[in-house]
UniProtKB/Swiss-Prot annotation:
It comes from Rattus norvegicus (Rat). Coiled coil: none annotated. GO terms for molecular function: identical protein binding. Belongs to the FAM118 family. The modification N-acetylalanine is found at residue 2. Residues 330-350 are annotated as: Disordered. The modification Phosphoserine is found at residue 9. This is Protein FAM118B. The gene is Fam118b.
Length: 350
C-alpha cells in the first residue's frame, strides 16, 4: 500500500495544482491496454480543434473552421477592408455552408495585395486580431490538457497539429520551456522533425498565425514538401512505425493536407495501430466513427460522456505512459552505463 501512496504523490507533483482533493464522483473510464502500454517516444500526438476549443472556449475562432472564417471576416469588416457587397457575399457563403476551404481562400486573397511582401498584407492584421491575447483566455481545465501534452513531449513524443493557434507553445513558455513552431514552408526543419531531431517542436501542418506566409489550405500550397521524396519518406515512416494519438480531432483523417502527408502511401497497410480519443456522445455517431476509423487502422476510444471528462482521462493516460517510458529509459541507461535516464526520472516529478 505504501508504494501506491508514493506513486499518487508523484502524480500529484506533476499535475497537483489541478487536484482539489475531492474523491471522484463517478467511475473513471478504464485505459485501453494497447494504448497505455505505449512509451512516449512511440507516439505522435495529433492536436485538433477540440483541444484548442477546450483550452480557450471563449474564443469562437478556435472551435471550428467556420468559426475561424467568421472571426476573420468580422475583423476585416471592423477594419473597413471590405465593401458592403463583398462582406454580404462572404456572409452568405458561410450561412449556406459553401466549401469552407474555398471561402477561406477567397477571403485571404481579398485581404492580401498582389505582392510578395507578406508584411503588407491585411490578412496578417486580421489574424493577429483574431488570436489576440490568447494567454489570458486559457482555462485551468484546458491548461491541464496542455500540461499532459507537454509532459509527453518532454519524454519523447512528437506533436503535430491542424490548428493555426500556438496555445501549446504559449503554455510551455509560461512554464519556462521553449517550444518551436514549424510549418511546411521549411523543408529542412520538417525533415529534422520527422527524424526526431527536433522533438521540442510543434509541426503545424496548416501553418501558424504568427507566420501568415506559411498558412496553407490545400495541398497545392505545399508542393515543395510533397515533391521532396526524402521528407515525404520520413513523414510517412512515422505513420507506419509509430502510433498516432488523435486528440480533439474527429474527422481529421479526412483532411486533405493530413491525407496527402501521411495516408497516401499507407492506404493498403493492415498492421497499423493508431488511436483516437473522442466523447461517447451520440451512440450511432460514435459507432459509425469507430467502424470508419478501424478500416484506417485507428482505434476510436471513448474518454467519457462529457467533454469535461477528457482532461482527467488524458492525465491518467499520460502518467501511465510516462511511467512506463521512464522505467524503459532507466533500464536502457543501466545497460549502456548512462546517467541520462536518471535525469528523465527526476524530471517527471518536478
Amino acid at each position: 500500500m505504501a508504494s501506491t501512496g508514493s506513486q499518487a504523490s508523484d502524480i500529484d507533483k506533476i499535475f497537483g495544482f489541478f487536484n482539489d482533493g475531492e474523491p471522484p464522483t463517478k467511475k473513471p473510464r478504464k485505459l485501453l491496454p494497447s494504448l497505455k502500454t505505449k512509451k512516449p517516444r512511440e507516439l505522435v500526438l495529433v492536436i485538433g480543434t477540440g483541444i484548442s476549443a477546450a483550452v480557450a472556449p471563449q474564443v469562437p475562432a478556435l472551435k471550428s473552421w467556420k468559426g475561424l472564417i467568421q472571426a476573420l471576416l468580422d475583423a476585416a469588416i471592423d477594419f473597413d477592408l471590405l465593401e458592403d457587397e463583398e462582406s454580404k457575399k462572404f456572409q452568405k457563403c458561410l450561412h449556406e455552408d459553401k466549401n469552407l476551404v474555398h471561402v477561406a481562400h477567397d477571403l485571404i486573397q481579398k485581404l492580401s495585395p498582389r505582392t510578395s511582401n507578406v508584411r503588407s498584407t491585411f490578412f496578417k492584421d486580421c489574424l493577429y486580431e483574431v488570436f489576440d491575447d490568447l494567454e489570458s483566455k486559457m482555462e485551468d481545465s484546458g491548461k491541464q490538457l496542455l500540461q499532459s501534452v507537454l509532459h509527453l513531449m518532454e519524454n519523447g513524443a512528437l506533436v503535430l497539429t491542424t490548428n493555426f493557434d500556438n496555445l501549446l507553445e504559449l503554455y510551455a513558455a509560461d512554464q519556462g520551456k521553449q517550444l518551436e513552431s514549424l510549418d511546411l514552408t521549411d523543408e529542412k526543419k520538417v525533415l529534422e522533425w520527422a527524424q526526431e531531431k527536433r522533438k521540442l517542436s510543434v509541426l503545424h501542418i496548416h501553418g501558424v498565425y504568427t507566420n501568415p506566409s506559411g498558412i496553407v489550405l490545400h495541398p497545392a500550397g505545399y508542393q515543395n514538401v510533397l515533391r521532396n521524396t526524402e521528407v515525404m519518406r520520413e513523414i510517412q515512416k512515422l505513420y507506419e512505425n509509430k502510433s498516432f494519438l488523435f486528440l480533439g480531432c474527429g474527422w481529421t483523417v479526412d483532411d486533405t493536407t493530413f491525407q496527402a502527408l501521411f495516408l497516401e502511401a499507407v492506404k493498403h497497410k493492415s498492421d497499423l495501430e493508431h488511436f483516437m480519443l473522442v466523447r461517447r456522445g451520440d451512440v450511432d455517431e460514435f459507432k459509425k466513427l469507430r467502424e470508419n476509423m478501424l478500416d484506417k487502422g485507428i482505434k476510436v476510444i471513448s474518454y467519457g460522456n462529457d467533454y469535461a471528462d477528457l482532461p482527467e482521462y488524458f492525465k491518467r493516460l499520460t502518467c501511465e505512459i510516462s511511467t512506463r517510458g521512464r522505467s524503459g529509459m532507466a533500464r536502457e541507461g543501466q545497460l549502456n552505463g548512462s546517467s541520462a535516464a536518471h535525469g528523465e526520472i527526476r524530471g517527471c516529478s518536478t
